[in-house]
Amino acid sequence: MKFPNLALLILLTTTFGQSLSSKGQFWASGLTGNDVPTGQSAFESSLGYIPTLSLSRDLSDFSFIDFEWAVRFDRLYSGDSLLSNHEKNHRLWARYTSEKFEARLGLQKIVFGPSQILRSLSWFDTIDLKDPTNQTKGVDALRLKWFPNNSLSLWSWAIQNEQDTLSFGGRAEISSSIGEFGFTVHSDPSTIPKQRFALDFRHDGYIGSWLETALITSENSDIKLTTIGADYTLPILN
């Protein structure tokens, strides 16, 4: 563990000390085959672990601040030989929450949209349905949320990308008697500027249904994406 992270942990534990919790996620997988390059083992395995530390402190009956720090460890083996070893921050954010407002700053997950596969709104995440950990890379961002009433929530964000430029966006989520609507925009002024616009909808009825549609436009091209899906829960053992 690097010294700055240890110093940060001590400082936050002292500041937030009202509530401290920890958890972790571990996974392992193996792969074997008969078409193996010379000198390589027929068996490959991977191990991963994400320990997470959470701290929180109440400010009033309706507001609190909290902090989360998670580190991801990944190892890949060929037989008993170590092929790769990665260690990096997975989440590192601080948040203020009140009855109608939330602000979160740091390395965090930003995910939205109703679809689970073929996701047109997978703009800032790497969630893969084939990955049993259901984990995604984080983004360095400031995200704000407002909740004017029970049927409306408004998001805004500023994200720092790998080129150290800031991109900006926002989202509105509306609940109605016929379903849940989402409207999203994002502007990325990087080397090749892009504008993104999206509409999504989910209806939870006898048969659930959802829609995601997005337009990504730049000087060179326009990309249109649409995902439509439905689901039905069988009344077994209910």
List where the protein language model places each region:
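Extracellular loop and loop/strand-boundary signature of outer-membrane beta-barrel proteins
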Residues: 36-41, 78-80, 127-130, 187, ...
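Short N-terminal segments immediately surrounding and downstream of signal-peptide cleavage
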Residues: 19-33
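Signature for the C-terminal beta-barrel architecture of outer-membrane proteins
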Residues: 19-21, 60-65, 99-100, 129-238
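Surface-exposed strand-loop-strand hairpins of Gram-negative outer-membrane beta-barrel proteins
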Residues: 29-49
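Outer membrane beta-barrel
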Residues: 56-153, 175
